Regions:
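Ferredoxin-reductase
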Residues: 1-78
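Structural signal for conserved beta-strand scaffold positions within catalytic alpha/beta enzyme cores
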Residues: 6, 51, 154-156, 209, ...
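A generic structural signal for residues embedded in beta-strands
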Residues: 36, 83-85, 227
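Short, Lys/Arg- and Gly-enriched loop/turn segments at beta-strand edges
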Residues: 42-51, 89-99, 237
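FNR/FR-type flavoprotein reductase catalytic core
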Residues: 68-216
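Local cysteine-cluster metal-coordination motifs and their immediate loop/turn environment
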Residues: 112, 190-191, 212-242, 270-275
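Short Fe-S-cluster ligation motifs
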Residues: 235-239, 243-280
Length: 280
């Protein structure tokens, strides 16, 4: 049940997992997510789907090792089974009817941006992509983005690969060059999505952001993933994960997302130390 059939290290801290989940694979669409638990005592974490194969009955996710649960996941092997793998959750990304779009991805968020970009491309849109990473060693899926985009700009914070600078700078240049986008779709760190939205707002370009705040049950019951969008309370798990970036209360969203930062750091260190002791 929920067996890991393939595990592939894309980068030192970024890993691809292909999970046996036939029912989810049959229903999944770009933009949707799953909630997984590594073991009976583990926490539930939301991860947006990277790919799905109804014929094989598998769902692929790409995960960066940044917290306690992702550390546990990184120590699992092919053949191991997850305790829970629930989905598909959330509403699929709307891609039809667009003539020209720009997809902006940041870090491991590019794993989420890619299936959306491909769907825009398959639906006939001209697709531009701007993807950003901290450095060359963290660049992922570049070849996939090239295949499904008409224009690709790769940015790194330190200039070790592609263009040096932020994705917002590259996006603004594309807009100022006369590209008239029907929509900009952004997925990545919350701060990045905030400033992508602020970049496009003066131009009046509709901007969609994919939100992955703290979630527990994924059905709207716990209220942990609530956001303020256009002055109304929304739940990312059932109303999203896609929202109008110009209407999100970003200050509140960022504040809520950092509520458990100290606790998460403690659990991360505790989990890492546990695995170190087991290895000794």
């Amino acid at each position: 049940m929920y067996r890991i059939v393939r595990k592939e290290a894309l980068r030192p801290t970024v890993t691809l997992y292909e999970i046996e989940a036939p029912l989810i694979a049959k229903k999944a669409q770009p933009g949707q997510f799953i909630i997984l638990r590594t073991d009976e005592n583990g926490e539930r974490i939301p991860i947006t789907i990277n790919a799905y194969d109804p014929e094989k009955g598998t769902v692929t996710i790409i995960v960066q090792t940044v917290g306690a649960t992702t550390v546990k996941l990184s120590h699992m092997k092919e053949g191991d089974c997850l305790a829970d793998f629930v989905g598909p959750l959330g509403k699929p990304t709307e891609t039809e009817g667009k003539k020209k779009v720009c997809v902006v991805g940041g870090g491991v968020g590019c794993a989420i941006a890619y299936p959306v970009l491909k769907k825009f491309h398959d639906d006939g849109a001209e697709v531009h992509a701007v993807v950003g990473f901290k450095n060359k060693d963290l660049v992922i899926l570049e070849d996939d983005f090239k295949k499904s985009s008409d224009k690709l700009v790769v940015c790194t914070d330190d200039g070790s690969y592609g263009r040096k600078g932020l994705v917002t700078e590259a996006l603004k240049e594309l807009i100022d060059a006369g590209n008239q986008y029907d929509e900009v779709f952004a997925i990545g760190p919350m701060v990045m999505m905030k400033f992508v939205s602020k970049t496009t707002e003066p131009y009046g370009i509709p901007t969609t952001v994919s939100m992955s705040p703290i979630m527990i049950d994924g059905t709207g019951m716990c209220g942990g993933c609530r956001l303020s969008v256009g002055g109304e309370m929304k739940f990312a798990c059932v109303d999203g994960p896609d929202f109008d970036g110009h209407k999100v209360d970003w200050d509140l969203a960022v504040k809520r997302n950092q509520m458990y930062k100290d606790f998460e750091a403690h659990k991360y260190e505790e989990t890492c130390n546990l695995f170190k002791k087991e290895a000794e």
